[in-house]
Amino acid sequence: MSKIRVAIVGVGNCASSLVQGVHFYGNAQGTDFIPGLMHLDLAGYRPSDIEFSAAFDVHAKKVGRDLAEAIYEAPNNTIRFADVPKLGVPVHRGPTHDGIGAYLKDVVPLAPGKAQNVAKILKETKTDVVVSYLPVGSEKATQWYAQQVLEAGCAFVNCVPVFIASRPEWERRFAERGLPIIGDDIKSQVGATIVHRILTDLFRKRGVRLDRTYQLNFGGNTDFLNMLERERLLSKKISKTQAVTSQLGHPMRASDVHVGPSDHVPWLDDRKWCYIRMEGTTFGNVPLQCEVKLEVWDSPNSAGVVIDAVRCAKLALDRGVGGAVLAPSSYFMKSPPQQFTDDEARELVEAFIRGDAEAAAPPERKPRAHEHAPRHTKRSKLA
């Protein structure tokens, strides 16, 4: 198989975990279960087939450095589980746009000079797949980078809660260019969203009505620091909330569901603590309560999914699939163009990996009566 040339936008904790992970699993062999990987071999592509071609950031101490050095630069504070040798990949100065909010500006000194020509660099480095790790609330920056991806002729993995793959106008532009996009908003391996989704689906399947629920999240990384600026949270709250409510079997009042980040606790570093509470009605109208506490290292938890999303994006490129790639988007992302249960989405992504034609465009699942339309008309104001 050919190599997968990957460019990274935003060299933060998530990028650090992905780069470390590619090195960590580079010599993994065999076909047995490998802890941390959903797929060692994904249609012939292994983690060792991923190589980094370019990186973009605005941080003064990251721009100009080798990617292998920049991933360990503060304020990055994720766990260091691999020592990555120099990659020969410099971090380029990207545009700032709306990427740095009121809280981040105190910890992210901006590199001097003008932004470099991103589309040109992507072409010159023969990049196949661009992965976006921009901060929450980077609406303009995400759309700007999406345009550069289109101009450079790359596939796009949109890990941030800015709606690109799930918006018809953007999805159409990728389809017209014959370029795949997997998005939007990465779903961790075993994170708050997927645990909450599966429990919600379990309630429905077992005949329990979910009456009220909350999901509270605390973390110590710059993602949680950035999200203290509530004005940047609109897309994030929409994304996390609909990921859960899409699994319901009945309508739920907006006041009875609360999902979102809650606070920044610096000493947690890149760890995230999540508290989920669910109150329901079961047999005989008898109440039921469920509480879950989840503790994870946030960024490795997402990298375990991105390492598959990148390979699926390259598969789509190889197969000439353009536009939103529904199967991997539905399994890997919180806000895909079309929601399925996680069991359904897993079956679809396995079929896609095998090359089953129908997996590229799965049949429409009729939304349940309470669900929002999948094309999110309210999101047009985010353009």
Model-derived regions, located:
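C-terminal active-site/capping subdomain that shapes the small-molecule cofactor and substrate pocket
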Residues: H39, C274-A383
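Active-site-lining helix/loop region of Rossmann-like oxidoreductase modules
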Residues: V9, S48-E51, K62, E73-N76, ...
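Rossmann-fold NAD(P)-binding glycine/threonine-rich loop
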Residues: V136-E151, C159-P180
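Rossmann-fold dehydrogenase core element
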Residues: R173-I186, G207, D211
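Short catalytic-loop micro-motif centered on adjacent basic/acidic residues
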Residues: V130-S132, F156-C159, I182-D185, T213
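N-terminal glycine-/serine-/threonine-rich beta1-alpha1-beta2 phosphate-ribose binding loop
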Residues: M1-Y145, L233-K237, C274
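Gly/Ser/Thr-rich loops at beta-strand to alpha-helix junctions
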Residues: G10-S16, L134-K140, V160-S166, K187-T193, ...
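Short acidic, glycine/serine/threonine-rich loops at helix termini
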Residues: V19-G21, R65-A68, P168-E171, I194-H196, ...
